[in-house]
Structure formats: C-alpha cells, structure tokens
C-alpha cells in the first residue's frame, strides 16, 4: 500500500483539501458553511485539532492543521467528515427554501451507488490528499485559533 497521501508524521502539520461529490456548490449558502465553521470550532475546542488556517470554497474545504493529544490526524478528519456530512444533508433535507434540494440529494445518492460501505447519501469525496507542509516550530508563531 502506498504512502503518498497518508498522515505519516503524528506531530506533523498538514494541508488537506476535501471536496463535495461532483464538486457541487453546496457552500454558497451560509447555513451550510456555518455547519463547517461550528464543526471546526468543536474539533479545536474538544477533539485536539490545532487549526492554523482554513478556507471554505463553494464546493470544497482547505485546512492547515495539526493535532494534540492522542488523536490521529486521520481519525479526526474521518469524524469531522462523518459528522458534517450527516449535518449538512439533514440541513438540506429540512431547508424548505433550498431550490436545489432534489437535484443535490439525487447526486448524493448516485455517488454512493455501488459502494458497499456507504448507506444513504455520500456527501464528501473520499480523498483528503494530506501534504505535510511545515514542522511545528516553523508555523507555531502564525496559529489562527
């Protein structure tokens, strides 16, 4: 198994990018962006995320982050993506003013077709493409949160 896109350094600081399936522009609505922001805040305050920079684009998210404590980078991102996926899809389902609701939900169902490990909807693409960017001592002075 290759190591090109893995979190190899437990104390490393990584740039990752993860996108909505089919690059759907979900984050044009503040309601859905707020779920990402609140989830990042929770990960920072409760789960050991050290967040240096983040950017929410219309269809994807960029993070520069590390971890403290016993949590692994991959476990943190797995949990973040799992929670935000469910929360955003639930928000879409219950948003009576979402004009793209049926179209988006259909895309999320189609994205999980033929994938045995996913039931319901697939919101995020599977890859994160982590790239270790700096050592902790280099970036410590520019921490955002």
Residues covered by each model-derived region:
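Short catalytic/metal-binding and nucleic-acid-binding patches
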Residues: 1-145
